[in-house]
């Protein structure tokens, strides 16, 4: 029961790391270990073993706590970066929403402008102009339109349009111009309204058909005026009787032109007794003055003077 054990015994409760309160040189004969002493030593050894066994667990807990703090720090960094990215996305979204609202506002303004009366008026004017270009503005003739051809070029279309417009304009002018009788053309020495008759027959007929001496209109066949008095000859506006004879030369004051007497000759309208005394030439400029009593023809001669011919009105 009273077994003596040294402090260095490995089977002792304290083990190798146990602090022995006695010296190892103490012999068993000198030490009297009672039961109470052994119990007290054994209890103290248990307490020391418990404290030594709890040491490594505390270090592991500290290591785990450090790792958790590091992980929390890294997670906080990631969270802050995600928060900043989210904020940037929110700012971009706000900008896009503002731009979208501005585009909607501009679209509404454009719709209001297109629906305004000004644009509608312009559209109507454009339709009218296109309609006028499609149809003739001179003489509308639906039968004269050329059918559309898919293989026609723009140049041919433009030429065809010019030809159509020219033809319609010519037709309108031909319809609006009055019909000139043949005896009037022969009197003026013309083949037609736009052509001068230079044939010998026309010249001969104008020169040879002189009025008779007893004809009432024989005194009005021709009167020669110098260039200095040409303005006086063309200033007759109402009747030949208003033309003053004071502006004529002294050699021509006795001319019947100064005080004409109007008579109605008994000749047919197709006769040429009262025609020009000279023929017409391409370089001659003929001016016609119409009066209630008849017509006056004034033209420039080759010497620079003026030829005046009075044609009384013929009775029907």
Swiss-Prot record:
Gene name, Swiss-Prot/TrEMBL: gmnc
PANTHER family associated with the record: GEMININ, GEMININ COILED-COIL DOMAIN-CONTAINING PROTEIN 1
Function: Regulator of DNA replication. Promotes initiation of chromosomal DNA replication by mediating topbp1- and cdk2-dependent recruitment of cdc45l onto replication origins.
Protein name: Geminin coiled-coil domain-containing protein 1
Record's keyword terms, sorted: Cell cycle, Coiled coil, DNA replication, Nucleus, Phosphoprotein
Compositionally skewed regions (Low complexity) per UniProt: 235-252
Annotated effect of mutating residue 239 to A: Abolishes phosphorylation by cdk2
Tissue specificity comment: Expressed in most tissues. Enriched in proliferating cells from skin and gut.
PTM field: Highly phosphorylated by cdk2; stimulates initiation of DNA replication.
Polar residues bias locations: 134-155, 207-234, 253-262
Residues in coiled coil: 82-117
Single annotated GO MF: chromatin binding
Result of changing residue 259 to A: Abolishes phosphorylation by cdk2
Region of interest called Disordered, as start-end residue ranges on this chain: 134-160, 207-269
Major place of residence: nucleus
Chain positions with Phosphothreonine modification: 153
Compartment(s) of residence: Nucleus
